[in-house]
Amino acid sequence: MSQSTSVLRRNGFTFKQFFVAHDRCAMKVGTDGILLGAWAPVAGVKRCLDIGAGSGLLALMLAQRTSDSVIIDAVELESEAAAQAQENINQSPWAERINVHTADIQQWLTQQTVRFDLIISNPPYYQQGVECAIPQREQARYTTTLDHPSLLTCAAECITEEGFFCVVLPEQIGNGFTELALSMGWHLRLRTDVAENEARLPHRVLLAFSPQAGECFSDRLVIRGPDQNYSEAYTALTQAFYLFM
C-alpha cells in the first residue's frame, strides 16, 4: 500500500499493512490491543462491532483479517479519538468497510437493528480513584462512563445467537468479569491466559463469550522465550501485523 509499510512515522504505530496515529487518543497502541485484535475468532463473521474504538486499532486489525464483504462498526464516545480513528481508517486499504460512529454505545444501540457475529472491546478496568489530569484519559482508563455490567448488557443486546464477544483484561479483573458474565447468562467459550515469560504468572487474559452454550477451550500464551525474543506462539499470532516480525 502506502508509505506506512516502508517509512516509520511518528506519533503512532506502523504495522505491515496500515499505520495507526494515536497522538490525539488517551490510550495508545499497546500489546493488549494487538493481542486482542490478532486473537479474536473471525471465521465466518459477516458484521463486527468495536466498542470503544479509540484510535481504530481493533477495527483495522479485524478488517485485515476478514474478507472484503465483512462490515465493521467502530463506536467511540470521545470526539478527538473518533476523529483520529476516522483518519487512520481513511488512510487504510479498508475505508469502505469500516464505519466510525462518534457516540455513546448505549444510545447508539437504541437506533440499531443489525446484529453482530463478533463484538470486540478493550475496555476500561480501573475503578474510580485519583482523577487523571486529562479527562479523556480518565474516560479511557476508568469504568465510569461504561461499567462492566453495562458493557455486557450492550453486547447481549446486539450479538447473534452464535456470535462471540471478546475482551482483554488484567488477569484478576478478567476472572471477576467472567463471573459477572456467567451470572448474566453468557457462556465462556475461549480463554487464553497471557504471561510475559514462562517464569511469570499470567498478567492478562483474553476472553470470548457467547450466548450459546458449548465447550470452553483454554490455553496459555507466553510472549517471550528464554532468550527474551518473541516466542514462537506470539510470533505466529501477531506476525501478520508487526512490521519487523
Curated annotation (Swiss-Prot):
The keyword Cell inner membrane does not apply. The keyword S-adenosyl-L-methionine applies. Gene3D superfamilies: Vaccinia Virus protein VP39 (3.40.50.150). It comes from the Bacteria. GO terms for biological process: methylation; tRNA processing. CDD domains: AdoMet_MTases. It catalyses: adenosine(37) in tRNA1(Val) + S-adenosyl-L-methionine = N(6)-methyladenosine(37) in tRNA1(Val) + S-adenosyl-L-homocysteine + H(+). One of its GO terms (molecular function) is tRNA (adenine-N6)-methyltransferase activity. Pfam families: MTS. Its EC number is 2.1.1.223. Its main location: cytoplasm. It is found in: Cytoplasm. One of its GO terms (cellular component) is cytoplasm. Keywords: Cytoplasm, Methyltransferase, S-adenosyl-L-methionine, Transferase, tRNA processing. InterPro entries: DNA_methylase_N6_adenine_CS, SAM-dependent_MTases_sf, Small_mtfrase_dom, tRNA_Adenine-N(6)_MTase, tRNA_adenine-N6_MeTrfase. Belongs to the methyltransferase superfamily. tRNA (adenine-N(6)-)-methyltransferase family. HAMAP family: tRNA_methyltr_YfiC. Specifically methylates the adenine in position 37 of tRNA(1)(Val) (anticodon cmo5UAC). This is tRNA1(Val) (adenine(37)-N6)-methyltransferase.
